[in-house]
């Protein structure tokens, strides 16, 4: 049986990342960083093992999200299209060995429904949907 392949593409199509296999974590996040990264009320993040990345194509740029604690390593390194600015993926110190991919950038096949919501204490008060069967943390 062949493993499922997911491909995330930026808005202009110049950059992409391809991974094999299902995500290790598939979550909605309500933290301020994800809200700012997406320009939305939450971020959809699919985390895959680093070894599952099979291809990255395009002229990427990076932005390092600094820690608020002096001398501490950066929180995240975000990787985005150098042409249109779409954030496609990132590496986070909190998820060693995993690469986070923006769920909304994956078109076909469609990612399964997120199974968890995190940082719920920062969720917008008007946002009332519930993920059926999902665990909720923080």
Predicted regions and their residues:
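A short Gly-Trp-Pro
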Residues: 1-9, 14-138
């Amino acid at each position: 049986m062949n493993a499922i392949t997911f491909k995330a593409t930026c808005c202009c199509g110049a950059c992409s990342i391809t991974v094999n296999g299902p995500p290790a974590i598939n979550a909605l996040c309500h933290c301020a960083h994800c809200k700012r990264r997406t320009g939305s009320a939450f971020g959809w993040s699919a985390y895959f093992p680093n070894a599952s990345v099979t291809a990255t194509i395009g002229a990427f740029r990076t932005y390092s999200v600094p820690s608020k604690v002096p001398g501490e390593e950066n929180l995240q390194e975000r990787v985005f299209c150098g042409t249109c600015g779409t954030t496609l993926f990132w590496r986070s110190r909190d998820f060693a060995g995993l690469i986070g991919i923006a769920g909304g950038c994956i078109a076909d096949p469609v990612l399964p429904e997120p199974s968890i919501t995190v940082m719920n204490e920062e969720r917008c008060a008007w946002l009332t949907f519930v993920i059926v069967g999902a665990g909720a943390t923080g």
